[in-house]
């Protein structure tokens, strides 16, 4: 476990801009003992029983204080604080970016990383790419903690849990009324609020809302999104507790698209005139029920059920056959899931058993050669894909001795599904019933507390991936096995002194049985990749007024077996050789704090043949915080001024090669943000 020490013109309908104001009316509600911790027992969520048993694995954790200090508008802005984690920002309004972890480059925009919110998966089975997820449905201020399980070490997720698991947990206890406001360059506005209200002696209500908008630094790059979440929990007595929660999100964004390399060098924040009408819009809503029952003092049962409905559309212009063409992708997604968790403690052992079922259906439409969102040809794809997943998992953590604390986990997944054409298609991708696939993934770890200062850990874990996209619905994929990933890791956590704390991890992950396409509709398991790397987190407090944090990750991902011999030994594209974040905070006065950050990102291959490379870059931020006097009537009020990209560095936040043309997503220029945080 890695945790910082305590010392240290479709124009679609616009999201409702009055969303935040409606929730903020609750700020005037009287609270019994505001800012005091509630005596009500919070309801638990899936996997929470495993929260204290992470010592055998690398699991960086960002707590509520870390999240509030970061003052971010988007959850993904936190990843720079996690060693080895990086975001390749596509700068495409409303479209998920690509998250890099453990030598994988396809998290978020693809399926290399699993993501959960209060134990429920955020990954989308067939949206754009298998495992796509959008964290903008989460309000940063509502989070209690964020944990990043590095590698396929968690039993909580199966498919998509390759590079690791992002585990988000919202606040479910306490009484609070918090507000965070930001405004700055390029029309940026972000307003968030989080409320914890005690209704009576047996009930609590938790609300969070966010409205964010911006004009963007480039032409036609405006965006707007709104999110509202609510959770009501009630204690019935006799060890029985229930919780009902819901979430609504709406977003729209315009996109100036990519630039050619020559265009970027000439005008870094410009726009290609061939891009017209690019952008996206999304609507998301979900509802869930949690029932907790205490079977005994040390044994707890959780039952849950949830449903999600979502629609998403994007328009994207890119090179195609010597010209630039716009494509349209539409997704209408519905999800239903349920599960049981049984957990307990017996002497020195903690255990968890789980059973869950999920059904996800996605209506998918794809058109090409549009002109400013106007279709000119029939649909290439018009179909519905369903994916059903039934899984069972178990984990045992046994504190036999401080020098030997093993963790044993096992997860079994079974998948079925079907593909049905909804209308005429011009595409030739397969669309039949999916053959049943199953996989069992073991997880083994051990931690050893040598003394008060030093803890060692080692682990071996396995993850897997199903055939991608519509390959799983092809008759020629009937005999395929899942792509398997096996990780070995060793690590240490060392408190060298009261001023210095270190965590180091070394890992090796080999993938086998990769899936390749031999001919239309025909596939086989062939291909291997080896990923190796190191991750370091350090916290140094040389004086009571100074704090330095350094997160560093180095990754090497190479192809070791491929049908194309020219690719053997090549680096996996879009994985930086290293990433580093150095942060400093100086409390120069009881009410004044100066802070800065320096982010380095190493060079990375852009294409599979490694013929094109994206150069290394670095970006610096500088900020000043002032704690406002209590006489203003606000609690914990802080006024902040932040300059992002202090030197106005011109850099590529991502590069790609499409139809033989090198394209650039320009990084954000220098921007100024004024922020205010307070409680009532």
What are these model-derived regions, one by one?
Residues 35-68, 76, 117, 294, ...:
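Short, acidic, small-residue-rich periplasmic hinge/interaction motif at the N-terminus
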Residues 105, 252-254, 258-266, 361-373, ...:
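Surface-exposed extracellular loop regions of Gram-negative outer-membrane beta-barrel proteins
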Residues 247, 396, 458, 488, ...:
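Conserved C-terminal beta-signal and adjacent last beta-strands/turns
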């Amino acid at each position: 476990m890695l945790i910082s020490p305590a010392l240290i013109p479709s124009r679609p309908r616009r999201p409702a801009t009055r969303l935040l104001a409606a929730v903020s009316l609750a700020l005037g509600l009287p609270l019994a003992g505001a800012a005091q911790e509630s005596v009500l027992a919070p309801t638990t969520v899936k996997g929470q029983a495993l929260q204290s048993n992470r010592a055998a694995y690398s699991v960086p954790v960002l707590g509520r204080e870390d999240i509030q200090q970061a003052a971010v508008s988007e959850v993904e802005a936190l990843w720079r604080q996690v060693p080895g984690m990086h975001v390749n920002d596509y700068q495409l309004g409303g479209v998920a970016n690509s998250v890099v972890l453990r030598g994988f480059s396809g998290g978020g925009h693809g399926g290399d990383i699993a993501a959960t919110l209060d134990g429920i998966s955020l990954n989308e089975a067939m949206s754009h790419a298998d495992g796509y997820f959008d964290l903008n449905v989460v309000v940063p201020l509502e989070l209690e903690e964020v944990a990043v399980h590095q590698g396929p070490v968690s039993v909580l997720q199966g498919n998509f849990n390759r590079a690791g698991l992002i585990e988000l947990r919202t606040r479910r206890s306490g009484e609070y009324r918090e507000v965070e406001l930001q405004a700055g360059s390029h029309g940026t506005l972000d307003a968030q609020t989080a409320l914890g209200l005690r209704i009576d002696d047996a009930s609590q209500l938790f609300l969070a809302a966010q409205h964010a908008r911006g004009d963007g630094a480039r032409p036609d790059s405006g965006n707007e999104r709104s999110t509202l979440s609510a959770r009501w929990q009630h204690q019935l007595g006799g060890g029985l507790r229930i919780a009902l929660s819901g979430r609504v999100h709406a977003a729209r964004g315009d996109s100036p698209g990519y630039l050619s390399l020559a265009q970027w060098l000439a005008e870094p924040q410009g726009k290609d005139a061939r891009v017209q009408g690019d952008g996206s819009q999304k609507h998301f809503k979900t509802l869930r029920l949690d029932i907790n029952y205490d079977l005994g003092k040390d044994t707890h049962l959780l039952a849950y059920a949830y449903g999600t409905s979502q629609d998403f559309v994007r328009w994207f212009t890119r090179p195609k056959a010597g010209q630039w063409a716009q494509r349209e992708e539409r997704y209408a997604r519905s999800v239903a899931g349920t599960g049981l968790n049984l957990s307990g403690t017996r002497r020195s052992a903690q255990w968890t058993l789980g059973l869950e079922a999920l059904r996800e259906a996605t209506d998918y439409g794809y058109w090409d050669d549009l002109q400013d969102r106007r279709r000119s040809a029939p649909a290439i794809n018009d179909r519905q894909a369903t994916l059903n997943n039934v899984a069972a998992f178990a984990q045992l953590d046994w504190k036999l001795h401080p020098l030997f604390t093993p963790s044993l986990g096992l997860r079994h997944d079974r998948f079925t599904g079907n593909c049905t054409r909804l209308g005429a298609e011009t595409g030739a991708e397969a669309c039949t019933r999916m053959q049943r696939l199953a996989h069992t993934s073991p997880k083994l770890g051990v931690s050893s507390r040598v003394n008060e200062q030093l803890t060692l850990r080692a682990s071996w874990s396995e993850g897997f991936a199903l055939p991608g996209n519509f390959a799983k619905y092809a008759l020629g994929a009937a005999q395929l096995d899942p792509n398997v990933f096996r990780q070995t890791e060793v690590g240490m956590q060392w408190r060298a002194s009261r001023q210095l704390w270190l965590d180091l991890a070394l890992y090796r992950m080999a993938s086998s049985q990769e899936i390749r396409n031999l001919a239309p509709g025909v596939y086989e398991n062939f291909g291997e990749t080896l990923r190796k790397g190191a991750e370091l987190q350090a916290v140094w407090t040389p004086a009571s007024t100074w704090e330095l944090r350094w997160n560093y990750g180095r990754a090497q991902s190479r192809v070791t077996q491929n049908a194309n011999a020219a690719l053997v030994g090549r680096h996996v594209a879009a994985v930086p050789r290293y990433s580093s974040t150095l942060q400093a905070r100086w409390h120069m006065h009881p009410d004044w704090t100066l802070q800065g950050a320096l982010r380095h990102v190493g060079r990375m291959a852009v294409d599979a043949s490694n013929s094109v490379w994206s150069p290394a870059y670095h970006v610096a931020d500088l900020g000043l915080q002032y704690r406002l006097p209590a006489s203003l009537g606000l609690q914990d009020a802080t006024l902040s001024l932040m300059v992002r990209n202090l030197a106005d560095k011109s850099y590529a936040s991502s590069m790609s090669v499409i139809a033989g043309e090198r394209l650039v997503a320009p990084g954000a220029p220098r921007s100024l943000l004024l922020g205010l945080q307070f409680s009532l």
